[in-house]
């Protein structure tokens, strides 16, 4: 049996925070505002994984009202959700994702993101797609006020 899930996340860019996307530190003058490290790509992947199994979303499982998640590394959350899907007898077939940002340019960082995420999720490079898009100067992302990501996750019952 196959299950598919769609994940999405957006965070505001602010001064005084590191920019972490896909578990990789990105050189930029601003970072993403959030209760955790605000890693939009990992959050989108997590929501896609949870959605594929019709489970609660990331905000319900890791509420921003819980101090134990304050500034937490999103890779810790991803590992928890990965272990959850494995415990339910599922494995990842593939993940297709987009990072949407006007700035900074993501392409130089994507190979490192893929390596990091593939290692964490026990998948091969050909099972994970990370693409970089812009908003052509439109909306909050296009005006460099935010960064968003989406991900489609396909799971298979083992």
Q: In which residue ranges do the predicted regions lie?
A:
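RNase III-family endoribonuclease catalytic core
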Residues: 2-111
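Short beta-strand segments
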Residues: 7, 129-133, 154
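Mid-sequence acidic-hydrophobic segments that form the walls
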Residues: 84, 116, 120, 154
């Amino acid at each position: 049996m196959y299950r598919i899930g769609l994940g999405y996340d957006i965070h505001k860019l602010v001064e005084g925070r590191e920019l972490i996307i896909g578990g990789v530190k990105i050189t930029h003058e601003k970072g993403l505002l959030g209760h955790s490290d605000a890693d939009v790509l990992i959050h989108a992947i997590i929501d896609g994984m949870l959605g594929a199994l019709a489970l609660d979303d990331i905000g319900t499982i890791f509420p921003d009202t819980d101090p134990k998640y304050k500034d937490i590394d999103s890779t810790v959350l991803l590992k928890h959700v990965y272990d959850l899907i494995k415990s339910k007898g599922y494995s990842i077939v593939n993940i297709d994702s987009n990072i949407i940002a006007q700035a900074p340019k993501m392409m130089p960082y994507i190979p490192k993101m893929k390596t990091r995420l593939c290692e964490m999720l026990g998948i091969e490079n050909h099972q994970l797609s990370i693409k970089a898009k812009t908003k052509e100067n439109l909306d909050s992302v296009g005006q460099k006020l935010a960064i968003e990501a989406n991900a489609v996750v396909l799971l298979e019952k083992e």
